[in-house]
């Protein structure tokens, strides 16, 4: 008797669209990661250094935001030192000196009014542990100390203060963001092939004395994941548009599809659930029980990339920067049916010609790997 599976039909049901069933999570490295950094002084002003033009002094000068430890002040190109107020005096240093840099001018910085120690939302601080903020008054850059209800600045070698000032803030009113010019670095990337895993099982019994063919249908919802983890923060609650080719890791090799544009409701990540169905027609020998299982293999890969990240703020202001990150994906490589060994469940004596109808245990049979789903 030929015990092969007579019919195997693999169907992909309910292909979900990103617009309909998209589940997302924000994809970013840390909550506080931005393009605004404190860079150690190196004798020259780095690109993107945050500055003001102080026209009160004569001659007028450009002052760059700097700090020594947590004390904010201004960096002078005349002596390559950070000048800051501390302990009633004007201090200056080039050793513990850091300059505030806004790489590619990506963060939208604004000066907003404060008074008597108050600071507006999203004010730029000098340290995470100390509540000292970057500020400026009529006479130049300084430090806002809310605990002392004022802005301190240097003047004629001394520490001076004022209750009227402006604080440096980051505008976070982003209404749209886009990622384009995505370039994957595939060299050295290995596709991690998952072990075949049983998703569903079903048992079919034949209590009769003749072989019968029974049809078994197994279904399983399997989730796939695509995520672009970038080094720059991805803002909550705004649409992210990603224009990129999509890496296909469903086989052992890695292929990049043609470029497509995708919109995500929150961040640059999506999870799609696809319903897979396996229908198997199995000849079941008399007085035997056969188990049919649905098996799936899921592949994973982490692929580094570089890209251009563009933000649009309320009011129409746009900023852009280069970024890098990792594309992480989980994809279904294949689903198939296994007909496992059959076991005897009845008494062969109940059937005439038992010796010719009762067979040995059924060997495991597999279906072929299905074709890739449409659109992948």
Swiss-Prot record:
Regions annotated as coiled coil: none
One Pfam family cited in the UniProt record for this chain: DM9
InterPro entries: DM9_repeat (IPR006616), Natterin_C (IPR053237)
GO CC annotation terms, alphabetical: extracellular region
UniProt KW Secreted keyword: yes
Propeptide residue range(s): 19-27
Enzyme Commission no: 3.4.-.-
Keywords recorded for this protein, A-Z: Disulfide bond, Hydrolase, Secreted, Signal, Toxin
CDD domains: PFM_natterin-3-like
Keyword Hydrolase set for record: yes
PTM note: Contains 4 disulfide bonds.
Secretion signal span: 1-18
Tissue: Expressed by the venom gland.
Main location: secreted
Root EC class: hydrolase
Compartments (UniProt record): Secreted
Activity: how regulated: Inhibited by tissue-kallikrein inhibitor TKI and trasylol. Plasma kallikrein inhibitor PKSI527 and classical inhibitors of serine-, metallo-, thiol- or aspartate-peptidases evokes a minor inhibition of the peptide digestion.
Role according to the record: Shows nociceptive, edema-inducing and kininogenase activity with release of kallidin from low molecular weight kininogen. The cleavage occurs at Met-Lys bonds.
Family: Belongs to the natterin family.
Protein name: Natterin-2
């Amino acid at each position: 008797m030929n015990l092969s599976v007579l019919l195997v039909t693999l169907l992909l049901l309910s292909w979900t669209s990103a617009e309909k069933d998209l589940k997302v999570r924000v994809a970013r490295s840390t909550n506080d990661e931005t393009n605004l950094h404190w860079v150690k002084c190196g004798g020259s002003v780095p690109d993107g250094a945050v500055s003001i033009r102080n026209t009160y002094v004569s001659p007028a000068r450009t002052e760059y935001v700097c700090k020594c430890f947590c004390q904010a002040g201004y960096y002078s190109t005349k002596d390559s030192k950070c000048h800051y107020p501390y302990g009633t005096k004007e201090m200056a240093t080039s050793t513990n000196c850091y300059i505030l840099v806004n790489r590619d001018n990506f963060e939208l910085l604004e000066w907003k009014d404060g008074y008597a120690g108050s600071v507006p939302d999203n004010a730029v601080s000098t340290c995470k542990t100390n509540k000292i903020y970057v500020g400026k008054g009529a006479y130049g850059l300084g430090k806002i100390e809310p605990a002392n209800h004022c802005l301190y600045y240097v003047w004629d070698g001394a520490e001076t203060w004022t209750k009227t000032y402006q604080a440096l803030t980051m505008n976070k009113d982003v209404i749209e963001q886009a990622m384009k010019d995505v370039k994957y670095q595939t060299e050295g990337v290995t596709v991690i092939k998952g072990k075949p895993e049983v998703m569903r099982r079903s048992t079919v019994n034949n209590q009769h004395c003749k072989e019968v063919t029974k049809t078994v249908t197994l279904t399983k919802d399997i989730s796939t994941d695509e995520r672009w983890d970038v080094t720059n923060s991805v803002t909550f609650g705004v649409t992210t548009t990603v224009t990129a080719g999509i890496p296909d890791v469903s086989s052992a090799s890695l292929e990049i599809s043609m470029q497509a544009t995708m919109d995500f409701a929150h961040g640059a990540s999506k999870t799609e659930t696809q319903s897979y169905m396996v229908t198997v027609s199995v000849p079941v020998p008399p007085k035997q029980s056969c188990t049919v299982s649905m098996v799936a293999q899921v592949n994973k890969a982490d692929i580094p990339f570089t890209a251009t990240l563009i933000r649009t703020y309320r009011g129409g202001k746009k900023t852009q920067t280069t970024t890098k990150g990792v594309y992480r994906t989980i994809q279904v490589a294949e689903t198939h049916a296994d007909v496992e060994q059959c076991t005897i469940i009845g008494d062969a004596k109940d059937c005439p010609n038992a010796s010719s109808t009762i067979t040995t245990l059924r060997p495991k049979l597999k279906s072929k790997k299905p074709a890739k789903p449409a659109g992948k």
